[in-house]
Amino acid sequence: MSNPILLGIFWHFIGAASAACFYAPFKQVKNWSWETMWSLGGFFSWIILPWCISWWLLPDFWRYYGSFDMATLLPIFLFGAMWGIGNINYGLTMRYLSMSMGIGIAIGVTLIIGTLMTPVLQGKFSVLFGSAGGRMTLLGVLVAVIGVAIVSYAGLLKERVLGIRAEEFNLKKGLILAVMCGIFSAGMSFAMDAAKPMHAAAQAQGINALYVALPSYVVIMGGGAVVNLGFCFMRLATCKGISLKADLAQAKPLLIANALFAILGGVMWYLQFFFYAWGHANIPADYTYISWMLHMSFYVLCGGIVGLLFKEWKSVGQKPVRTLVLGCMVIILAANVVGLGMAA
């Protein structure tokens, strides 16, 4: 396996680790509605950071974005909005299914669709089955799905031991939402593929290959921001139990602490895709669709590791922990299989 491929896998792991940890600062926010907290963190992760980093990277910020027509920008923006819908559905999925079942189905669906639909839509179906490397990467995707399923089953065992149930368990609604979440969340993978002209234009301006995807985040995450912020503002305006005015009426020290934690959560959330761009830049051109599989499977892997480090599995017995470790090992195996496939 070549050094660039190893680096690509490594950076995808770092990005996924940030994704697995980003909600920890949000948990420290007190006496705020989820909508206010999510909006503030999201404002930094979807708008402030993408714009600031692009402003810093691009020699001529406005000329760069002005060089693209609507036929190029609109699909990228809409795929970003599609991914934003997936974010909202993710929370609803957890509401109607258990955490483990919701994550297992949603991540499994988005991993498969986001990984395989890109080469199919590009007309590169032969790449998947027509070469030894393509077949091996497909095997790696299958192994990753199995690993995600095992980790999800470990979560189910944990929930049974701890007596955790979904807030409003509804199998039919939960399954529909989980599948929808998986489909819509794959919008990020599609957006990255649609943004290739933006990546090429950034590289033509002399930007390092590791950073060429970052300017496209202004458009991609702009689409996600419209959906997420619109959803949050609508709820703040219409739901009786929550109020922006009440959230901002807290004592000044608490307001400052809440704001800092929300912003930190937003920064950590953005870092997952910052390093996703680094990983993506090191993946061979014929296998860029594998970036999504690496990110999502490592997200589940890192989530399991974080849970163990924070002793969330301390009192659940040996079987759930052993199952979790097995699932994590299978995901690591999947990453190695995919890496060998790309190097073939």
Curated annotation (Swiss-Prot):
One Pfam family it belongs to: RhaT
Q: Where in the cell is it found?
A: Cell inner membrane
Listed under catalytic activity are:
L-rhamnopyranose(in) + H(+)(in) = L-rhamnopyranose(out) + H(+)(out)
Q: Name one GO molecular function term.
A: rhamnose transmembrane transporter activity
Q: Which cysteines are joined by disulfide bonds?
A: none
Q: Where do transmembrane segments lie in this chain?
A: 4-24, 38-58, 68-88, 101-121, 137-157, 175-195, 207-227, 255-275, 290-310, 324-344
Membrane topology, as annotated, equals: Multi-pass membrane protein
Which of UniProt's keywords are assigned here? Answer: Cell inner membrane, Cell membrane, Membrane, Sugar transport, Symport, Transmembrane, Transmembrane helix, Transport
Family named by the database record: Belongs to the L-rhamnose transporter (TC 2.A.7.6) family.
User: Per its database record, what is this protein's job?
Assistant: Uptake of L-rhamnose across the cytoplasmic membrane with the concomitant transport of protons into the cell (symport system).
Q: Which NCBIfam families match?
A: PRK13499.1-1, PRK13499.1-3
**What name does UniProt use for this protein?**
L-rhamnose-proton symporter
Source organism of this protein record: Pectobacterium carotovorum subsp. carotovorum (strain PC1)
